[in-house]
A protein has these predicted regions:
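Acidic active-site catalytic centers that drive phospho-/nucleotidyl reactions
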Residues: 98-99, 191
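Short, well-ordered coil↔helix boundary/capping segments
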Residues: 64, 120, 178, 200-203, ...
């Protein structure tokens, strides 16, 4: 941890960009940071570990485990879609940060007659946390400005009915700018694919906003 403090900000951002653009198994990040004790310098990531989730929806475990599966899925999607360096970085950082709001919002609530773990409101809360984190590690603003609205809207598809109006799609596009709906759908796919043993798939609701 002491060695980290001697690194210039440019080196930190360079290493994170390398992780986002080139890593085949980016999900190893949490384990690596924990083993090196550098995790203490990234509380936004550190706080994800141990945060419980409803096992009905998240059989893979806590938020930290889920996030590492999501970034691995995002890397596969980026390769499949042949994304350029910046587009891949946006997807990977959005995947890493998408649940940054969960540690502060997770609590037991009664749902359908049972006590379940919920994290209502974690999406809008996560946006500013993602911006703070990415800015602190030196990621350029053109990437940060796309990641933040993706984090804040990554559950939008759950709020749509069977029919989505053009007006609703236009409003979503405005909320996402400068990111795009197409980018958001890739994040939604990565998020849904980060819940093993559930199958990797794009939720049907997400297809309706395209």
């Amino acid at each position: 941890a002491g060695e980290y403090g001697t690194l210039p900000k440019e080196r930190v951002s360079e290493e994170f960009m390398k992780w986002a653009v080139k890593s085949i198994r980016p999900g190893r990040l949490l384990g690596y940071l924990t083993e090196t004790s550098w995790i203490a310098h990234f509380p936004e990531i550190q706080k994800l570990a141990g945060v419980p989730q409803d096992p009905t929806w998240h059989p893979e475990g806590d938020v930290g485990t889920h996030t590492m599966h999501v970034v691995d899925a995002a890397a596969h999607i980026a390769i499949r879609e042949q994304l350029g360096a910046d587009a891949r970085a946006v997807l990977l950082f959005a995947s890493l940060a998408h649940d940054f709001g969960k540690p502060a919002t997770t609590e037991l609530r009664e749902r359908e007659g049972k006590m379940r773990w919920t994290s209502w409101g974690h999406e809008p809360l996560g946006g500013p946390i993602a911006r703070q984190f990415l800015t602190r590690i030196g990621i350029k603003s053109s990437i940060v400005d796309q990641v933040v609205p993706m984090v804040e809207n990554h559950l939008t598809h759950h709020n749509t009915g069977t029919e989505v109006s053009r007006r609703a799609v236009r409003r979503l596009a405005m909320r996402l700018a400068p990111a795009s709906i197409e980018q958001l759908v890739l994040l939604i796919e990565a998020d849904a694919s980060g819940r093993p043993p559930r199958p990797s798939e794009l939720p049907a609701e997400a297809g309706r906003i395209l």
